[in-house]
């Protein structure tokens, strides 16, 4: 049997989970709250094969630089934030809002590659 997988990226600011924005105003609120501050991105990964299941999580601290309303609205109007937890994607223009990342960059993207490879090894699958 093959392996099934599930990934879930979540963004937390001061213990509050920031989901996907409902609209542009919600995206602006989230990005304004994140601007100039540290937040945490957590990604949960579950692998399944038959009856066997393995779940792990990875956390990474992300520091946003200060950003003004006009700059944030320009980003929002591009559409990138609307389908992303925390209203940004580090792999796109959202990278311009990030000042520093402490931890796994790929986790911030939503796929902690090293964690996934270690989990796959527990199922006997090696990537290198």
Name each model-derived stretch.
Residues 1, 5, 9-128:
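Anionic-ligand binding patches
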